[in-house]
């Protein structure tokens, strides 16, 4: 920062700024927030503001400066927060009119991406995550300051931490050191480094020291930045990753759980399909259920019972949803009360919500499902609080809490007297206007008011000469009018303004006292919010089940899906046009090798199964005529091809990295979906890798797997791997054109119909004709090498190798030295890569 002549104000600025080097300091000067030096230069550029100079551009050391009006600062602050910056709000803590010299100032709040309370997406959480490394175990504390919720878990590796953060996509992450910061910078999420911690009884639910340390880091950060009561924070809830089906960011993206892959929007995702919730807090809970499907049969069954109860009783379902449509976001209303930012409209929304509770509870009297009965028991009507809010607040109060108009007549005798005095004074002034018009004969005479001159009598210049000398005292001359006052008018003005100021002050004091009273109900109101959120989600799942004709799945040890459907794709097709398919997997049939033409629906079939499995484990009904499913601990997917441009990884490297995750972390209780593995490299490399991966999964993991491939040669593996079965997606030729039937049948596909797909894409006719000629020549030559049919799982002692390199002795020598039985698929990939490089040099 440049050297400048330090006035008392600038000394104050430097002193405050030194404590907040990582935030833009919004320094209050009168009606503006001003920024100086580098803060001003960056903010002016980011927000396209005019950059000026505090001491004039001609000064020897001009001070860069920009500013925003305090009444519209929220707009600018939001833009900076969304860009990942922090903002420190520095307010005047003394009345400038009552202070001689420099006004005291202090930072009242630091707003960060993870603590921003305003302009929130209703159905999205705003997560702030703290990570603490305790002896190689990583505690994760995830909090949402806008609702007061927080969760704790422990992870065992940096890779697991990175996956967790990529899956959560929090708004901000706090770490203790540069090592973790370096690990997480690749995510692009705003990071803060902090070493201070603060103990809290809210961390009593922590399962280990790593979780406790992470929460204390989170709590210290909130205390330091928010500088206010955090009474709305709820006790942290610890969970084990193993309690839920694990879905990493890659799987969520491939299955389009939360965003459409095509548009990046919520529309077109599974979440969008399921979201029939009517409250914001229900929408947030639904997303969390989808992020963490259950891995306990009892929890799933309890939810299914509740959904079934609501599916069977459509009148109850409809009536409950109608009631919930009039329920506001209690979680965030309570948070605003705890923060001290709730206004009268917020409390009216809370009151209106509480007044719906007797009806909701009455409707739930007849339910049979245990979860619904528990919800009914947790619904307190808060009659005392509701009546107090009804008595205190008008139905449509203003947003501002300092300009009156909030408190209902009859709540405070003192306030009523002040308001009556103000009303009487204004009535006197209204009468004065009529009286003076008659007395002067000037019909255009009027009484006006502004904040500078107060009340005045205004007469046009043309009529001013009609006034008696000395009748009024001239106060202000305008271009076309004269403004006057009288002693009596000023006396009434003092009475009116005095009553108005006192009434506004009293209203504010009454409102603050009321808000503090509401704060004492924080914990039971948060329990009410949790119950209503769960009811809302269960209703939403019931609505979808009834509307889409879903069935209740049965939890078993095997997979048996009859006429299953893709939940999202079927909704964009005309009713009845989606082609449903069966799927069976059990202990003897654990893997399906899927072949079929491009565009025939192989990937859709795979995604369909995964989505049905997820729906089962969130407690939902599923799109099928019947379904029996096991509990999956995790779903791994490699579907689609995409380069990772940020880290410089090719399509093939991304493919292998994701495959490595599956083959090294999957268990026999996992579900693996691998689509067209090996297409990112040469034909023989890809084919060899695909076969090795299939064999490894079958022999070493035993996970239920769907493996689609364009290598038709792999279908011979059915003969040597007992747990593998071939299926194909059927297509037929009709009048020289391919017709995709989207039906999955046993056995292998005999053709890929690639040229037909090219025709559908409307490639030039000459190109298509040439492709047919080349294909005919290749097929007649029959030069395609076949996979060795003796390839087998581990019980086979020797595996013959393909003769891929006929003329390169060096490559052949390296190839013969490879011990394939001791290699995993990733090691095989590396070996093949080295062989390929050697062959290129030869």
Curated annotation (Swiss-Prot):
GO terms for biological process: mismatch repair. Belongs to the DNA mismatch repair MutS family. This is DNA mismatch repair protein MutS. Signal peptide: none annotated. The keyword rRNA processing does not apply. One of its GO terms (molecular function) is mismatched DNA binding. It comes from the Bacteria. ATP binds at residues 596-603. Keywords: ATP-binding, DNA damage, DNA repair, DNA-binding, Nucleotide-binding. One of its GO terms (cellular component) is cytosol. It comes from Exiguobacterium sp. (strain ATCC BAA-1283 / AT1b). This protein is involved in the repair of mismatches in DNA. It is possible that it carries out the mismatch recognition step. This protein has a weak ATPase activity.
């Amino acid at each position: 920062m440049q050297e400048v002549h330090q006035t008392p104000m600038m000394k104050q600025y430097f002193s405050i700024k030194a404590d907040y080097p990582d935030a833009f300091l919004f320094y209050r000067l009168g009606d503006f927030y001003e920024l100086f030096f580098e803060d001003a230069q960056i903010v002016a550029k980011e927000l396209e503001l005019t950059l000026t100079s505090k001491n004039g551009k001609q000064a020897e050391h001009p001070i860069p400066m920009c500013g925003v009006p305090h009444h519209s600062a929220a707009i600018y602050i939001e833009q900076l927060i969304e860009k990942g910056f922090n903002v420190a709000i520095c307010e005047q803590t003394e009345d400038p009119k009552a202070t001689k010299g420099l006004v005291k100032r202090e930072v009242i709040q630091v707003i960060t991406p993870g603590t921003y309370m305003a302009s929130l997406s209703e159905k999205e959480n705003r997560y702030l995550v703290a990570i603490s490394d305790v002896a190689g175990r990583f505690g994760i504390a995830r909090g949402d300051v806008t609702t007061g919720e927080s969760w704790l878990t422990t992870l065992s590796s940096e890779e697991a931490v990175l996956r967790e953060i990529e899956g959560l996509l929090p708004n901000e992450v706090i770490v203790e050191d540069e090592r973790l910061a370096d690990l997480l910078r690749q995510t692009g999420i705003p990071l803060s480094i902090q070493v201070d911690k603060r103990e809290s009884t809210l961390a009593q639910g922590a399962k280990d020291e790593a979780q406790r340390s992470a929460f204390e880091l989170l709590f210290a950060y909130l205390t330091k930045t928010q500088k206010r009561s955090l009474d709305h924070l709820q006790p942290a809830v610890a969970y084990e990753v193993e309690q839920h089906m694990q879905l990493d960011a890659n799987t969520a993206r491939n299955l389009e759980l939360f965003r459409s892959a095509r548009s990046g929007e919520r529309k077109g995702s599974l979440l969008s399909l399921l979201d029939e919730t009517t409250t914001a807090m229900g929408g947030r809970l639904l997303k969390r259920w989808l992020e963490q499907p259950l891995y306990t049969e009892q929890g799933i069954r309890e939810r299914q019972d509740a959904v079934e109860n609501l599916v069977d009783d459509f009148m109850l379902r409809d009536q409950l949803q109608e009631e919930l449509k009039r329920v506001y976001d209690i979680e965030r209303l309570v948070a605003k009360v705890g923060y001290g930012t709730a206004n009268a409209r917020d409390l009216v929304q809370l009151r209106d919500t509480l007044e719906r509770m007797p009806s909701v509870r009455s409707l739930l009297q007849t339910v049979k499902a245990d979860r619904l009965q528990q919800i009914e028991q947790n619904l307190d009507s808060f009659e005392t609080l509701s009546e107090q809010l009804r008595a205190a607040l008008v139905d449509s109060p203003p947003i501002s809490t300092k300009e009156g108009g909030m408190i209902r007549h009859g709540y405070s005798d003192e306030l009523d007297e002040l308001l009556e005095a103000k009303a009487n004074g204004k009535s006197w002034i209204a009468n004065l206007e009529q009286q003076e018009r008659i007395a002067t004969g000037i019909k255009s005479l009027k009484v006006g008011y502004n904040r500078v001159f107060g009340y005045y009598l205004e007469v046009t210049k043309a009529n001013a000469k009609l006034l008696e000398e000395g009748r009024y005292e001239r106060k202000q001359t305008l271009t076309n009018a004269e403004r006057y006052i009288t002693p009596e008018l000023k006396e009434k003005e003092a009475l009116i303004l005095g009553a108005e100021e006192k009434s506004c002050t009293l209203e504010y004091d009454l409102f603050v006292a009321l808000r503090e009273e509401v704060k004492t109900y924080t914990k039971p109101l948060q329990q009410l919010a949790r119950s209503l959120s769960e009811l809302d989600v269960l209703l939403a799942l019931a609505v979808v089940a009834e509307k889409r004709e879903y069935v209740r799945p049965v939890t078993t040890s095997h997979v048996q899906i009859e006429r299953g459907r893709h939940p999202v794709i079927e909704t964009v097709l005309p009713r009845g046009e989606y082609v449903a398919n069966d799927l069976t997997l059990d202990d003897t049939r654990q893997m399906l090798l899927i072949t079929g033409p491009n565009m025939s629906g192989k990937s859709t079939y795979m995604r369909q199964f995964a989505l049905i499995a997820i729906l089962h484990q969130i407690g939902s009904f599923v799109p099928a005529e019947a379904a029996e499913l096991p509990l999956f601990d995790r779903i791994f997917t490699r579907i689609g091809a995409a380069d990772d441009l940020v880290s410089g990884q090719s399509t093939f490297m991304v493919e292998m990295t994701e495959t490595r995750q599956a083959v090294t972390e999957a268990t026999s209780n996992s579900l693996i979906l691998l689509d067209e593995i090996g297409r990112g490299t040469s034909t023989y490399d890809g084919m060899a890798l695909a076969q090795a991966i299939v064999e490894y999964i079958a022999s070493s993991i035993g996970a239920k797997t769907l493996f689609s491939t364009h290598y038709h040669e792999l279908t011979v593996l059915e003969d040597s791997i007992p747990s593998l079965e071939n299926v194909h997606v059927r297509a037929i030729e009709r009048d020289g054109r391919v017709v995709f039937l989207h039906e999955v049948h046993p056995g292998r596909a005999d053709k890929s119909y690639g040229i037909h797909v090219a025709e559908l894409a409307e490639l030039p006719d000459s190109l298509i004709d040439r492709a047919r000629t080349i294909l005919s020549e290749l097929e007649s030559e029959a030069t395609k090498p076949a996979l060795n049919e003796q390839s087998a799982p581990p019980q086979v002692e020797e595996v013959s190798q393909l003769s891929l390199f006929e003329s390169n002795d060096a490559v052949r020598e390296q190839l013969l030295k490879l011990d394939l039985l001791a290699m995993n698929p990733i090691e095989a990939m590396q070996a093949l890569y080295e062989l390929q490089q050697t062959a290129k040099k030869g």
